[in-house]
């Protein structure tokens, strides 16, 4: 066993390169969060003065943060989880019984299916429009919910909509979704992994029953951390306390929330989320600027021969997927095959596209300066021209 490999683990990507990986752009730490990371990096560092519940700790101000975060989101109750997937899991575990059905969009993240499976439920999908836009047909939630009820005699246990999907970056109609669910009497969960911390969600009306988000994907926090927000009426059911009692010891923990396994995220992740929170509150006000940069990025990328943006047009979110047949043709004859594009970009100071992928690529310029976005575009243009692709 060679232990030396662990003695100097470093990561130079953010210092040396512009990172356009969509899952990382919203999780870049603020200077305040980096400082907090050093202060609270030791294990149970937030538990110096804990009276039994992590979300009630007042120093650091975790209890106050839960209240402020709920206000920021326009929801009633919040818990910090180890990621959006664990927030979904908590809701499904509380609401679903063996054999129940969860209705979800056909662009839902794989963790929606895994969480449902773990809860003993199955998933019925709502279709999308297919190539090239892949827009979720939100109106179809009503039909699918009715079909489930007709087949089973009971409505679905839960309906879930991915606010912005991780494949094409489409912004779905959350308010229409919630209205349909209200009318059908089905709890509505909005997966905001790519919108919470980027966009202002406080004005959604009507509110979903549940909203989940990602701290490390969208709130400038280190992993693993996420958010479960809910309307007050669900607090008792989803955040129920433990009811078991030890038959020998007689011990019981009625204040420990079952779906949270008593306590959730402690230490560096929650503290970095808190430290970045003032910045996040301000940056959601600049969302239109992020959309402007994204649309310019798309326009410049589509100057390259064959490049075509997939998903809804014009873009309303920073996550972009492109068809890149020209780069794919180059890759077929290149000694490095699909890795050539990643390597050519890295030589020009840009990383973040999936290594080996040239048929389609995903990227985000969220949080970059105009000059950095121009650098990214210039890198793609130079590579295209070097390999004989026309740039108009």
UniProtKB/Swiss-Prot annotation:
Positions where N6-(pyridoxal phosphate)lysine occurs in the chain = 217
Give a yes or no for keyword Thylakoid in this entry: no
Carries keyword Transferase?
yes
Report keywords, A-Z.
Protein biosynthesis, Pyridoxal phosphate, Transferase
Task: Name the HAMAP family on file.
Answer: Sep_Cys_tRNA_synth
Q: Which GO terms describe its biological process?
A: translation
Class of enzymatic activity (EC top level): transferase
Domain of life per record: Archaea
Q: Which InterPro entries match?
A: PyrdxlP-dep_Trfase, PyrdxlP-dep_Trfase_major, PyrdxlP-dep_Trfase_small, Sep_Cys-tRNA_synth_arc, SepSecS/SepCysS
**What role does this protein play?**
Converts O-phospho-L-seryl-tRNA(Cys) (Sep-tRNA(Cys)) to L-cysteinyl-tRNA(Cys) (Cys-tRNA(Cys)).
Where is pyridoxal 5'-phosphate bound in this sequence?
84-85, 191, 214-216
Q: Which reaction does it catalyse?
A: O-phospho-L-seryl-tRNA(Cys) + hydrogen sulfide + H(+) = L-cysteinyl-tRNA(Cys) + phosphate
Cofactor requirements of the protein = pyridoxal 5'-phosphate
Q: Which NCBIfam families match?
A: PRK09331.1 (NF006810), SepCysS (TIGR02539)
- Quaternary structure per UniProt? Homodimer. Interacts with SepRS.
Q: Which organism is it from?
A: Methanopyrus kandleri (strain AV19 / DSM 6324 / JCM 9639 / NBRC 100938)
Q: Which GO terms describe its molecular function?
A: Sep-tRNA:Cys-tRNA synthase activity
Might you give the EC number(s) for this enzyme?
2.5.1.73
Checking PANTHER family in the record gives:
CYSTEINE DESULFURASE (PTHR43586), O-PHOSPHO-L-SERYL-TRNA:CYS-TRNA SYNTHASE (PTHR43586:SF3)
> What is the protein name given in its UniProt record?
O-phospho-L-seryl-tRNA:Cys-tRNA synthase
Q: Which family does it belong to?
A: Belongs to the SepCysS family.
The taxonomy runs:
Archaea, Methanobacteriati, Methanobacteriota, Methanomada group, Methanopyri
């Amino acid at each position: 066993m060679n232990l030396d490999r662990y003695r100097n683990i470093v990561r130079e990507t953010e210092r040396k390169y512009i990172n356009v990986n969509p899952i990382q752009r919203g999780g870049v730490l603020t200077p305040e969060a980096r400082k907090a990371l050093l202060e609270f990096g030791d294990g149970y560092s937030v538990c110096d003065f804990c009276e039994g519940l992590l979300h009630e700790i007042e120093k650091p101000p975790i209890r106050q943060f839960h209240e402020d975060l709920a206000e920021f989101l326009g929801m009633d109750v919040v818990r910090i989880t180890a990621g959006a997937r664990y927030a979904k899991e908590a809701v499904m575990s509380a609401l679903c019984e063996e054999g129940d059905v969860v209705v979800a969009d056909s662009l839902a993240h794989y963790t929606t299916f895994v969480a449902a499976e773990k809860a003993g439920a199955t998933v019925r999908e709502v279709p999308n429009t297919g190539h090239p836009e892949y827009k979720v047909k939100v109106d179809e939630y009503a039909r699918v919910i009715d079909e489930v009820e007709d087949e089973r005699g009971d409505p679905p246990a839960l309906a879930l909509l991915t606010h912005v999907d991780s494949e094409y970056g489409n912004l779905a109609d959350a308010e229409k979704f919630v209205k349909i669910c209200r009318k059908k009497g089905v709890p509505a969960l909005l997966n905001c992994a790519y919108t919470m911390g980027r966009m202002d969600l406080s004005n959604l009306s009507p509110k979903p029953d549940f909203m989940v988000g990602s701290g490390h994907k969208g709130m400038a926090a280190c992993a693993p951390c996420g958010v479960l927000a809910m309307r007050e009426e669900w607090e008792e059911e989803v955040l129920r306390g433990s009811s078991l009692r030890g038959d020998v010891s007689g011990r019981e923990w009625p204040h420990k929330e079952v779906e949270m396994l008593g306590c959730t995220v402690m230490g560096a992740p929650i503290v970095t989320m808190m430290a970045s929170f003032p910045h996040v509150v301000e940056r959601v006000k600049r969302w239109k600027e992020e959309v402007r940069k994204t649309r310019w990025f798309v326009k410049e990328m589509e100057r390259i021969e064959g490049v075509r943006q997939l998903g809804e047009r014009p873009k309303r979110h920073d996550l972009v997927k492109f068809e890149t047949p020209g780069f794919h043709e180059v890759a077929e004859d290149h000694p490095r095959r699909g890795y050539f594009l990643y390597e050519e970009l890295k030589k020009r100071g840009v990383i973040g596209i999936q290594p080996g992928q040239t048929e389609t690529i995903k990227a985000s310029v969220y949080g970059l300066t105009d000059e950095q976005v121009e650098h990214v575009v210039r890198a793609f243009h130079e590579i295209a021209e070097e390999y004989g692709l026309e740039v108009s």
